[in-house]
Curated annotation (Swiss-Prot):
GO terms for molecular function: DNA-directed RNA polymerase activity. SMART domains: RPOL8c. It comes from Arabidopsis thaliana (Mouse-ear cress). It is found in: Nucleus. This is DNA-directed RNA polymerases II and V subunit 8A.
Amino acid sequence: MASNIILFEDIFVVDQLDPDGKKFDKVTRVQATSHNLEMFMHLDVNTEVYPLAVGDKFTLALAPTLNLDGTPDTGYFTPGAKKTLADKYEYIMHGKLYKISERDGKTPKAELYVSFGGLLMLLKGDPAHISHFELDQRLFLLMRKL
């Protein structure tokens, strides 16, 4: 049932930390590539809460709701009330997709830009894997180390 609400999921490997240099004390920009879908990602992570190192593998999922039945999120957190998608992951952020761009050529690429309260994500790769996202869509990012 949960797989129906997940819009994107893949296993990533951390390639580099802070590729453009360290900008913030408690935030690290993670550069990672995915195993199955050959996606590229930059993701800002609060590494004081969720530390990552080069070579770490993690599952990353994007979903519009945490409710397993697919109902929209109410915006209120009630601990222990019912099982949610968050129960299967270790690090969760909520944000808004603010930009989608596509580039044509020999190998077309699509890019998603999401802001999680100022922590940013760029997800780049084959347009077929990210064509079902919509501009201004609210998304949950869910991560779990492998």
